[in-house]
C-alpha cells in the first residue's frame, strides 16, 4: 500500500512539474542538491523532511563539497547566515570559517553538517545548505524541520 502511494506521489510530482514547471510536492526524505542559474534558492526546490522533539538534537548532512568550494548554512529563505566556510588555501590545513549569532538557535556546524541542539518549536522552519563552486555556480539543498 505504501509503495503504491509513493508511486502515485512520484507520478503526480512529475506531471505537475511537466505541466506547470513548478511544484511544491515533496517526495523525498533525503536532501537533493539543486543547481541555481541565478544564485537564488530555486522556486521548485524539494525539501527533505526532518522531525525533532523539544529539547532534542537534529543533524543535517551537507552534500557534495570540495575544499575549494565556498559553503554556507542558511536559516530560511531570507538568506540569514548561520555559518560559512571558505576555500582552503594551498598548504593551509586550518579551517577558515565564520559563525554567526542567531537568536533562539543553539548549534554546531562544520563544512559538511549542521547540528541543531536543544530544539524548541521556534526552530521549525526550512534550513538551506549553499555551495558555490570554483566556477561561481550555486547549488542548494533544503531541509524542512518540524519540532514537536
Curated annotation (Swiss-Prot):
<feature type="glycosylation site" description="N-linked (GlcNAc...) asparagine; by host">
    <location>
        <position position="118"/>
    </location>
</feature>
<keyword id="KW-0946">Virion</keyword>
<feature type="glycosylation site" description="N-linked (GlcNAc...) asparagine; by host">
    <location>
        <position position="135"/>
    </location>
</feature>
<keyword id="KW-0325">Glycoprotein</keyword>
<feature type="glycosylation site" description="N-linked (GlcNAc...) asparagine; by host">
    <location>
        <position position="144"/>
    </location>
</feature>
<dbReference type="GO" id="GO:0055036">
    <property type="term" value="C:virion membrane"/>
</dbReference>
<feature type="glycosylation site" description="N-linked (GlcNAc...) asparagine; by host">
    <location>
        <position position="104"/>
    </location>
</feature>
<feature type="glycosylation site" description="N-linked (GlcNAc...) asparagine; by host">
    <location>
        <position position="65"/>
    </location>
</feature>
<protein>
    <recommendedName>
        <fullName>Early glycoprotein GP48</fullName>
    </recommendedName>
</protein>
<comment type="similarity">
    <text>Belongs to the RL11 family.</text>
</comment>
<feature type="glycosylation site" description="N-linked (GlcNAc...) asparagine; by host">
    <location>
        <position position="108"/>
    </location>
</feature>
<feature type="signal peptide">
    <location>
        <begin position="1"/>
        <end position="21"/>
    </location>
</feature>
<feature type="glycosylation site" description="N-linked (GlcNAc...) asparagine; by host">
    <location>
        <position position="22"/>
    </location>
</feature>
<keyword id="KW-0472">Membrane</keyword>
<dbReference type="GO" id="GO:0016020">
    <property type="term" value="C:membrane"/>
</dbReference>
<feature type="glycosylation site" description="N-linked (GlcNAc...) asparagine; by host">
    <location>
        <position position="57"/>
    </location>
</feature>
<keyword id="KW-0732">Signal</keyword>
<feature type="glycosylation site" description="N-linked (GlcNAc...) asparagine; by host">
    <location>
        <position position="44"/>
    </location>
</feature>
<keyword id="KW-0244">Early protein</keyword>
<feature type="glycosylation site" description="N-linked (GlcNAc...) asparagine; by host">
    <location>
        <position position="49"/>
    </location>
</feature>
Amino acid at each position: 500500500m505504501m509503495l503504491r502511494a509513493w508511486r502515485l506521489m512520484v507520478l503526480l510530482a512529475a506531471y505537475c512539474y511537466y505541466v506547470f514547471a513548478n511544484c511544491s510536492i515533496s517526495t523525498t526524505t533525503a536532501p537533493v542538491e539543486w543547481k541555481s542559474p541565478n544564485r537564488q534558492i530555486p522556486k521548485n526546490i524539494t525539501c527533505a523532511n526532518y522531525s525533532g522533539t523539544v529539547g532534542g538534537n537534529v543533524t543535517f548532512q551537507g552534500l557534495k563539497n570540495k575544499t575549494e568550494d565556498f559553503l554556507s548554512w542558511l536559516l530560511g529563505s531570507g538568506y540569514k547566515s548561520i555559518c560559512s566556510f571558505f576555500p582552503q588555501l594551498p598548504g593551509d590545513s586550518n579551517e577558515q570559517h565564520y559563525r554567526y549569532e542567531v537568536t533562539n538557535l543553539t548549534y554546531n556546524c562544520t563544512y559538511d553538517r549542521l547540528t541543531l541542539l536543544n530544539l524548541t518549536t521556534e526552530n521549525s522552519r526550512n534550513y538551506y545548505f549553499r555551495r558555490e563552486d570554483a566556477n561561481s555556480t550555486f547549488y542548494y539543498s533544503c531541509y524542512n524541520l518540524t519540532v514537536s
